[in-house]
């Protein structure tokens, strides 16, 4: 009888199967399990060790695809970026503030939004902030270029201070090619395109 060890059980003729864990009494472990400084999860019905993105208890978690160890923080899964709470391991959605910056994840899938979509989401936080000539912060108010400079800085993009200077940065695109998060520049003014012609 297996005791206090992980055991691979072959279930199919091609050699595939499941990893399981047995405690010191020889009982199959089910649910959460802590071992050698790491958390694992075993299906409560089958005892199969969780690997990859795994849904349980109302949230998604991510377990290393080889070892089954619960992962935390930023993770790349099938080419998309996700973030798993650094304390609970649960996948986050929506707005997340970390390292002094804001990030945005899809409310349904948890995948990080594209940069343009994140810029729009962050900009929307400041709707209703008063217009102030020369303003550069949400505490004192913004003018147009102060607003765009402030929003873009959250994403590590350094814009010049005035609308005329910002117009000279970046690359011009045709109106048909404009994307959410792009700057829209016109005489004496600059704004952020949010999509749908706005």
Set out the residue ranges of the language-model regions.
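Residue-level recognition of conserved structural "scaffold" positions that shape functional pockets
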Residues: 44, 59, 65, 107, ...
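Glycine-centered flexibility sites
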Residues: 26, 31, 52, 73, ...
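Generic structural signal for beta-strand residues in well-ordered domains
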Residues: 12-13, 124, 184, 192
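Solvent-exposed, well-ordered amphipathic alpha-helical segments
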Residues: 37, 58, 75-81, 96-102, ...
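...with weaker cross-activation on analogous glycine-rich loops/strands in unrelated enzymes
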Residues: 149, 157-198
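N-terminal capping segments
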Residues: 113-145, 149-162, 186-189
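Extracellular adhesion/carbohydrate-binding repeat motifs centered on closely spaced tryptophans
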Residues: 1-118
């Amino acid at each position: 009888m297996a005791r206090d060890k992980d055991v691979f059980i072959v279930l199919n003729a091609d050699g595939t199967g499941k990893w399981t864990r047995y405690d010191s009494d020889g009982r199959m472990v089910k649910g959460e399990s802590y071992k050698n400084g790491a958390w694992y999860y075993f299906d409560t019905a089958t005892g199969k060790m969780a690997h990859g993105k795994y849904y349980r208890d109302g949230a998604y978690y991510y377990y290393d695809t080889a070892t089954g160890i619960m992962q935390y923080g930023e993770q790349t899964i099938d080419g998309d970026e996700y973030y798993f709470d650094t304390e609970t391991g649960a996948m986050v959605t929506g707005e997340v503030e970390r390292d002094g910056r804001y990030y945005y994840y899809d409310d349904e899938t948890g995948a990080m939004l594209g940069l343009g979509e994140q810029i729009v989401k962050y900009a929307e936080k400041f709707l209703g902030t008063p217009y102030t000539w020369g303003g550069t912060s949400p505490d004192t108010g913004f003018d147009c270029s102060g607003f765009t400079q402030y929003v873009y800085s959250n994403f590590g993009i350094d814009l010049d201070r005035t609308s005329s200077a910002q117009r000279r940065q970046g690359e011009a695109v045709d109106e048909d090619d404009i994307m959410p998060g792009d700057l829209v520049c016109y005489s004496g003014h600059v704004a952020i395109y949010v999509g749908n012609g706005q």
